[in-house]
Amino acid sequence: MQAATVVINRRALRHNLQRLRELAPASKMVAVVKANAYGHGLLETARTLPDADAFGVARLEEALRLRAGGITKPVLLLEGFFDARDLPTISAQHFHTAVHNEEQLAALEEASLDEPVTVWMKLDTGMHRLGVRPEQAEAFYHRLTQCKNVRQPVNIVSHFARADEPKCGATEKQLAIFNTFCEGKPGQRSIAASGGILLWPQSHFDWVRPGIILYGVSPLEDRSTGADFGCQPVMSLTSSLIAVREHKVGEPVGYGGTWISERDTRLGVVAMGYGDGYPRAAPSGTPVLVNGREVPIVGRVAMDMICVDLGPQAQDKAGDPVILWGEGLPVERIAEMTKVSAYELITRLTSRVAMKYVD
């Protein structure tokens, strides 16, 4: 009998990278593995994707873990560096870095490095989070081209705010700003992440940066799943029944007695709870799979246990397998039921959840 376990399907991960190459055949792939590869395991994910052209991370520590784990492909620091003292390490490890503000640019100009750094100038085209404003961008770009510590040519990167919406005027405006600035400049270009890859083929350019879709999860909020785009779920959150109980009509279950049975039935108790990262907000009716059969959660999610209504004729027994999301039950459905985004669901699992990798 197993308690909370994440099963990561390496074959599905490799399939998804190939599928994304089919969707963006002229672009190179930055496989985004920040936040422990969206909960899938940083090193194991990178090692499963030797055909990725580069890897994208949010923190220098993540990049260093990749290098220490034997990953030699280019690694892009998507948020840039946070401290000028990190520049010698970035140079020595041949990391690529975003540069998005005056402080970073000044640090590059003042640094003493053995080798120049590959830079991606971040242009704020409308996300208004990181990046150089368009009216300041030409002067900023010129300084990068003159900086001895910057490997030439300077590359240009931006990020969509609403790429998960088809036919979005804001995205069209961002794309126009990006195209205007990049015109005539020799560096590589990248603006498309998961939503851009799926919905905005005109944004693919030299590099694309698949994040959540690489793991088989749709970035869209339209009830689509990764399968709608030819991708397969990589993560399955699994557990087991630890008890099966007879339950009488009119009896409540769990804290607060929020669910009362309308029939005699059999209840299963699953070794899973918010202590594992499963959302406490999951309402009664949220589906799980028991022996491949969909059954509803009943009552409140507790720290360590969830109750499910197996039905009056159920033959399930303690030790039988349970899938909370993944193969056969898309995490996007759980996100819709719980009002917790799929991004958060897959990255919030706690350290007591075991990790298992299969091919």
Swiss-Prot record:
Enzyme class: isomerase
Catalysed reactions, semicolon-separated: L-alanine = D-alanine
Keyword entries, A-Z: Cell shape, Cell wall biogenesis/degradation, Isomerase, Peptidoglycan synthesis, Pyridoxal phosphate
Pathway note: Amino-acid biosynthesis; D-alanine biosynthesis; D-alanine from L-alanine: step 1/1; Cell wall biogenesis; peptidoglycan biosynthesis
Protein name: Alanine racemase, biosynthetic
Annotated positions binding substrate: R129, M303
One GO cellular component term: cytosol
Function: Catalyzes the interconversion of L-alanine and D-alanine. Provides the D-alanine required for cell wall biosynthesis.
Active-site feature positions: K34 (proton acceptor), Y255 (proton acceptor)
PANTHER family, A to Z: ALANINE RACEMASE, ALANINE RACEMASE, BIOSYNTHETIC
Native organism: Escherichia coli O157:H7
Keyword Isomerase: yes
Cofactor(s) required, per the database record: pyridoxal 5'-phosphate
